[in-house]
Swiss-Prot record:
It is found in: Secreted. The lineage of its organism: Eukaryota, Metazoa, Chordata, Craniata, Vertebrata. The keyword NADP does not apply. This is Interleukin-3. The keyword Oxidoreductase does not apply. The gene is Il3. Keywords: Cytokine, Disulfide bond, Glycoprotein, Growth factor, Secreted, Signal. It comes from Rattus norvegicus. GO terms for biological process: B cell apoptotic process; B cell proliferation; cell population proliferation; cell surface receptor signaling pathway via STAT; cytokine-mediated signaling pathway; embryonic hemopoiesis; extrinsic apoptotic signaling pathway in absence of ligand; hematopoietic progenitor cell differentiation. GO terms for cellular component: extracellular space.
């Protein structure tokens, strides 16, 4: 009888300790999951990848050059390039759409972006000339850490390709 009583009391003490220890492990695991949800985008490399896909051509309009060099208009111009890319090259034959979208993580939006005029692209040729000039002047881009959604497990039915979230 004494043996059963002491075994029960030991088990009653070990159970709460085991539960506390298990919760501590779960908390530290969650912290490491958060680390895995971050990755670094090398913004300069993304800009160079866009640059090599565009033909070498000169941009002559000095107003366009000034607009495209203006650091306060970077995000507005990027948004305009994304719209123009969709309009002029909806099949993404230049294969730059995803890279332009990644650049959105590298170039922060300004509070006054909605009222600023962006670059105007007349056609695909004009778009490529201006985009090339724009990307050449993104020399000071720094790597940024971005979050990404958790990767689906092999049992997931709704697999989606990884998207970058800024």
């Amino acid at each position: 009888m004494v043996l059963a009583s002491s075994t029960t009391s030991i088990l009653c003490m070990l159970l709460p300790l085991l539960m506390l220890f298990h919760q501590g492990l779960q908390i530290s695991d969650r912290g490491s999951d958060a680390h895995h949800l971050l990755r670094t985008l090398d913004c300069r490399t993304i800009a160079l990848e866009i640059l090599v896909k565009l033909p070498v051509s000169g941009l002559n309009n000095s107003d366009d050059k000034a607009n495209l060099r203006n650091s306060t208009l970077r995000r507005v111009n990027l948004d305009e390039f994304l719209k123009s890319q969709e309009e002029f090259d909806s099949q993404d034959t230049t294969d730059i759409k995803s890279k332009l979208q990644k650049l959105k993580c590298c170039i922060p939006a300004a509070a006054s972006d909605s009222v600023l005029p962006g670059v105007y692209n007349k056609d695909l040729d004009d778009f490529k000339k201006k985009l090339r000039f724009y990307v050449i002047h993104l020399k000071d881009l720094q790597p940024v850490s971005v979050s990404r959604p958790p990767q689906p497990t092999s049992s997931s039915d709704n697999f989606r390709p990884m998207t970058v979230e800024c």
